[in-house]
Design a protein with these regions (language model features):
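N-terminal short leaders/motifs
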Residues: 1-2, 277
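Catalytic core of soluble alpha/beta enzymes
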Residues: 155, 160-295, 309-321
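Short helix/strand-capping turn motifs
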Residues: 298-301
């Protein structure tokens, strides 16, 4: 078993307030708890952040405990590939995996994009999420987002009254590109009829219309809008059964880290799938690793830190709807003393 000379310096639960309530079909959130870990070789450190997948029953406290238990059992922090065999996909593994990438960048003096064999990242257009609300409030939120420079909006839907919501959003921001996320809420609806109505309003992508266990109901449907798997696509093992979907949403917290997410992206391309890179509510430390995947994604939805009331220092930057990396993760050689 490959255990390298890396220890766990810190694991902590941190809370970030959400600027406005973040509402989807499953409820509203006014804050998010994340798990943040720091790994070290005694000279350099690496940091990673994970947001628990609450619909899987994860909690930040549980993730922190899982990280501590793994490191104690192994006598140190295992390397990334070994970590994939020891810990299931989820926020805990994501935090550790990304911390290991960050540490390697510091130790080698090479940015993570170079270590991963990628090109230097460029700014990417990110979607901005319009929370589920009344048509009037969603229209105003869309107009506000457009005034801030966002040209790609992602609207949260719930099944009942969705067409009226998108019609209102179109009035509020007539020139934006639109994608929608049903968060599994269309179980009692005619998916084809819903998709046709939204296609007429210029919707370019529909995320997760049905519950994950109902994927078979999508098979054979001729839809005018591509369908993207989110809750149905957690990790690499899920790809083989997603024939009814034209796209997948890769989130590092679902996949369990950048290592798995990169493997998923390559496998998805080989299978002819289009790629969305998404995120949970998170600080820029949690978003930064996904920025590398965004470089070759068809849709980018990395607004998780933009929805917070306050972010970390060195946060990612956004201008005219385009996201640029900050200085939090994966770039410079930073010693323990420099970062403390």
């Amino acid at each position: 078993m490959a255990v390298i000379d890396i220890g766990l310096q810190q694991v902590a639960v941190e809370r970030f307030a959400v600027r406005n309530a973040f509402t989807i079909s499953r409820g509203a959130k006014t804050f998010v708890d994340v798990v943040m870990c720091v790994v070290t070789d005694g000279i350099f450190i690496g940091r990673g952040e994970g947001t628990p997948i609450y619909y899987h029953g994860e909690t930040a406290e549980g993730c922190a405990a899982a990280i501590e238990a793994l490191v104690q059992a192994q006598g140190g922090v295992p390397d990334r590939e070994t970590l994939r065999t020891l810990m299931p996909p989820g926020a805990a593994r994501n935090a550790l995996d990304c911390a290991l990438w960050d540490l390697e960048a510091a130790r080698t003096g090479k940015p993570v994009w170079a270590l991963a064999g990628l090109k230097a990242p460029q700014p990417v257009r990110t979607a901005y999420t319009i929370s589920l609300d009344t048509p009037e409030k969603m229209a105003q939120a869309a107009a506000d987002a457009r005034a801030r420079g966002f040209t790609l909006l992602k609207c949260k839907l719930t099944g009942d009254g969705d067409q009226a919501r998108i019609e209102a959003v179109r009035q509020g921001a007539p020139d934006v590109d639109l994608i929608v996320d049903a968060n599994e809420s269309w179980a009692d609806l005619d998916v084809q009829a819903q998709a046709r109505a939204l296609a007429d309003l210029g919707v370019a992508l529909i995320e997760q219309p049905l519950p994950a266990q109902a994927d078979a109901a999508l098979a054979g449907l001729a839809l005018p809008v591509p369908i993207c798997a989110d809750e149905s696509c957690q990790s690499l093992d899920d790809l083989a059964r997603l024939g009814a979907y034209q796209a997948i949403n890769i989130k590092l917290d679902k996949a369990g880290g950048l290592t798995e997410a990169l493997a998923m992206a390559h496998a998805a391309r080989a299978a002819g799938k289009r790629i969305m890179v998404g995120c949970m509510l998170a600080s820029s430390l949690g978003i930064a690793p996904a920025f590398l995947l965004a470089q070759f994604a068809d849709w980018v939805d990395l607004d998780g830190a933009l929805l917070l009331a306050h972010d970390r220092e060195g946060a990612m930057n956004v201008a005219s709807g385009y996201l640029s990396p900050g200085t939090l993760w994966g770039e410079a050689i930073i010693t323990d003393a420099q970062r403390s």
